[in-house]
Structure formats: C-alpha cells, structure tokens
Design a protein with these regions (language model features):
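Conserved Rossmann-like nucleotide-cofactor binding loop
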Residues: 15, 38, 167
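Glycine-rich FAD pyrophosphate-binding loop
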Residues: 24-47
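Short beta-strand to alpha-helix junction loop
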Residues: 58-65, 89-113, 252-259
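Dinucleotide-binding Rossmann-like beta1-alpha1 core, especially the glycine-rich loop
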Residues: 49-90
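Mid-domain catalytic core of redox enzymes
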Residues: 26, 125-252, 257, 265-270, ...
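Conserved flavin/dinucleotide-binding core of flavoenzymes
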Residues: 225, 231-354
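N-terminal Rossmann-like FAD-binding beta1-loop-alpha1 element of flavoenzymes
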Residues: 3-32
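A conserved beta-strand/loop element that lines the FAD pocket in flavoprotein oxidoreductases
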Residues: 115-127
Length: 354
C-alpha cells in the first residue's frame, strides 16, 4: 500500500494549525515545524492567575463566519459567548465574542486534533533553506532546519505549505527555481512591528473596551479586556497597550523594562490615579512581522510545483487590525487546503491514466 503524501507545514500559527488539521483529517501525513517553543503565533497565550490569556488582544465578530464554523467543527461552539463592549467615542455598543477559556482552547484543540491523526509538531525548528531533492526516488523537497542547540536537521516531504512572512520566504528559497517577479513582489511587502504590553492591575483603567489613541504616542490603542468579559480568574483587571512601529524606531530595540516605563508614563498622564503599585504583573510581546503595509498585486498560492503559500500578507485582509484577522486566516487556510486536495486528486488521476 502506498504511503500517503507527506506535507511539511512551516509555521504553527493559526493558519498553519488550521491547514495541518484539515490536511491530517484528509489523510495526508503532516509535519509542522515552528521556530518558537509554543504554538499559536499571534494567538500565543500566557498563564495569568488561573486562566490563559492571549499576549495580543483578540475577539470574534458576528460576521466571522469561517472562524465560527471552525469552532463548531472542533466542538467549541458552547465555549463561545457574546458580550456587549463599549468603545470610546462610539454611540453604541458592539457585540463581540470570546471563548470561555480564551483562544488557548482553540490552539490546544487544533494541536490535539493534529497529533491524534498522526501529525507531528516540532518546536524550536527554524527553517534555514528549502531545496528540491536531486534523487527521483526520494520525496520532492528537503527542508533544512536549525535547532535550539545550533545543530541542524533535514526533513524530507512531498509538499511544502509555508505560512510565515513574505521576506523570510525569499530568504529560505534561494535554492528553488521561482519566478523573479514572484520574489520581487515578496520583497516589496513592508511590515510594521508591534509592541504590546499586557498588564494585570488592581483597579480598572477605563470602562471602555477599546480606545484609539490619536497622535504620536508610544501606543495607539488601549484594550480593557476585562471590561467586556469580566475579571474571571485572572486575579485582577486585564489591560493591553498596543503600538505599531518601524523596526528603526528606538523603542523597538529598548529593553522590556524601558518600554514598560515609557508606556506606563503615558498611561499615568492620562489617568494620574494609576500608579505602579496598582500593577500586579505585566508581560511584553514583540511581533516583528505584525502588520503588512502592502501586499503583492497577485495572490500567489503556488509559486512552484508542490509548494503552497498560506500567508495573510499576500491578501488585502492583512491591512486589518490583528484582532480582526483570525477569520481571514481561517478562510485562507480553507482555500489553500482545498487547492492542495484538488491538485493531489488531479495528480492521482494522471498517474492512473498513464
């Protein structure tokens, strides 16, 4: 009996995990490689009190059909609750969704579904090069990964599914014969980085869930998470301060403590009653490729034979705020998996005819 086609999914963010889950369910042999030590990407979570919470703010909208359908498919519909949220400067409240156990539940169930179906997820694997195999009896691609101890390993697979940043894709595919226009379009994509300070405070900063900060400030948005979902078991009130920057900005290279002091000084100016004694704990998350400022003219989904790209930076949806991108990630993952399955079926038909 012929072994199922092997697929290497590069990246264990939401896009990569959804693709891996659906491919494993369809019978493909799936291996996911992730540079970080934990899954989730921009949905990565941290323990806060007795609960998990996202290091970057996220919520669900009623219009997020693909994401809501995924939750139903995974048996998480009952965890989805809808809340009224007050937005600063808005006349009405917005109805937003959040999971009982946060989006950690979504990531955990996806990981479990992948591994239950024989999929493998490798953490601490940084892809350094992708090359074609020169041996026709071997799988089509060779993926070289650098491990945490600086050693390297080569993985073999029939198909590549890449979910990372556009520029990194160019750097790791020099050995592949890809169209010059495709490479140029990827290098033309520019990104803003993001710094997000997550604080647990004794008292709330505001009753509003979301507030945009105008002008040249160290952060551009305040999200009072617990004003929407309540204090739960976090042990206090959860506040996010989020800002986008170019990596040339001095704040990007500052230490975590320096960034905290800059952010808190501005927060205290807005509300003098806030003191550092009101802060119980805090986390700082830096995201290098957070917000693409532009995208290629064409949505290249398959730059080479057996090589697929599922990166939100390839689509106009990348311009949305990160907390709105989950639905676009799931929708694009669905389309990519459908394309892979269609191509695989076509290859099998051609093989049977020959």
């Amino acid at each position: 009996m012929q072994e199922p086609t092997s697929i290497c999914v590069i990246g264990a963010g939401l896009s990569g995990l959804v693709c891996a889950y659906k491919l494993a369910r369809a019978g493909f042999r799936v291996q996911v490689v992730e540079q970080q030590s934990t899954p989730g990407g921009m949905l990565a979570c941290s323990r806060l009190g007795s609960e998990y919470i996202e290091l970057l703010p996220h919520h669900i909208r009623k219009s997020d059909r693909s994401l809501i359908a995924l939750l139903k498919d995974l048996g998480l519909s009952e965890e989805l609750k809808w809340y009224d949220s007050l937005w600063y400067g808005k006349a009405s409240r917005k109805k937003l969704g959040y999971l009982d156990n946060g989006f950690h539940s979504l990531i955990a169930v996806l990981v479990q579904e992948i591994t239950d179906r024989g999929g493998i997820i490798q953490y601490g694997y940084t892809v350094s090069e992708i090359a074609r195999s020169e041996d026709p009896t071997r799988p089509r691609y060779r993926v070289q990964c650098v491990l945490g101890d600086s050693s390297s390993i080569i993985l073999e697979c029939d198909t590549i599914l890449y979910t990372g940043s556009c520029r990194n894709l160019v750097h790791i595919t020099h050995a592949l014969d890809m169209p010059t226009d495709f490479r140029d379009s990827l290098m033309d994509v520019t990104y803003q980085a993001n710094i997000c300070l997550l604080m647990l405070t004794k008292t709330p900063f505001t009753e509003c869930y979301s507030r945009q900060i105008p002008g040249d400030e160290p952060f551009q948005r305040i999200i009072q998470h617990t004003s929407m979902v309540g204090p739960r078991r976090y042990g206090g009130h959860v506040l996010y301060l989020s800002g986008n920057y170019l990596t040339s900005a001095p704040l990007w290279t500052a230490t975590d403590a320096e960034i905290f002091n800059v952010f808190f000084k501005r927060l205290q100016y807005m509300n003098p009653s806030m003191t550092k004694n009101t802060v119980k704990t805090w986390r700082l998350q830096r995201t290098r490729y957070a917000k693409p400022l532009n995208h290629p003219l064409d949505e290249f989904i398959q730059p080479a034979e057996g090589f697929y790209v599922c990166s939100l930076a390839m689509t106009p949806s990348s311009a949305e705020d990160s907390k709105y991108r989950m639905d676009a990630c799931v929708s694009q993952a669905n389309a990519t998996v459908a394309k892979i399955k269609e191509d695989f079926s076509r290859e099998k038909e051609l093989e049977s005819e020959s």
